[in-house]
Amino acid sequence: MSPEATTRSGVVFRVLDAMDAPHSGRILRLRLQSGEAPSIKSLKGSTLKAVSPDGDECRGKVLGFAAFGGKPSNERLARTGRIDVHVEELDDTGPVGLRWEVHPS
């Protein structure tokens, strides 16, 4: 199965922490909630759909990864289920916050 297909097949992350990035965008600390961990390569540059507990939706683009939790790798994501992503919000419905569900698309 290709990394792109894996990313779209029921993968759901939960936002554990969200903060403004130093220059632009947001840093989201994500935990894999369900599905198989996607590859780092498939996440970079992908579009994410975030859904709040109230049902509000926000889209964002993954610009890169925050390294303060350690260098991101496929093995680390598969083992821990956690990743820190730097996202640019693509619409004005955000900001994405705690307990939001994030779906890669």
Where are these regions (language model features)?
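C-terminal effector/interaction modules appended to NTPase cores
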Residues: 2-105
